[in-house]
Amino acid sequence: AGQYAQEQSISPVKEVTNTGAANVEFKNLPFGYYLVRSSLGALCAIDTTNPKAVIKEKNEKPIVTKEVQENSTGSWGKQNDAEIGDKILYQSVITAADGNPSNYVFHDTMSAGLTFLKEEVSVYINNAETPLTSGYRILTGQEEGKKDAACTFEIHFENGIIHTNDVVKICYAALLNENAKVCDEETNSVYLTYGENGKTTIETTKTFNWSFGVYKFT
């Protein structure tokens, strides 16, 4: 019912936004029949015989983590060292904790010293040995359908490809290019948008370039 109301653009009688409190309350509603829908998917029908009702949200928000590989050791963490021309490997993991995963879009933003390698992207679900070959689109630059113009690339997942409690691993790579800052960091940040207007916190990794020039004087 909630999905139908959204698809038919049925305007809500009242909207309440949770700003961090444990509870939200609808006030001054006339008696009648109501369908209450949360952004995480909880539904509750309320009728005139029970004007006070409590809705407990059992769904959780999806979680995104991100790591970068240190070339010298092969270990994964929040930062690494590299030289110009090195390929940098990343992996991000989405845990679909929400009750009805939909409208999943993975957003990635790389700083100027990193060049995204689109052909290096692989997506795995639930520790599968082979990556997905369909069910998502990769959009870069100013491609039509891209939601955040500032992002380097986005992965748009088709509804139905990800289910509740699925774990989605995204593996990809970039080159440290000539714009990389010396003795400073290049950043790679990711977040996920989902549902009607949900958004996870931003996860960031850092790559440090310790290259230095050699000068000869005569």
Where are these regions (language model features)?
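Solvent-exposed loop/turn and edge beta-strand elements of beta-rich ligand-binding domains
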Residues: 1-218
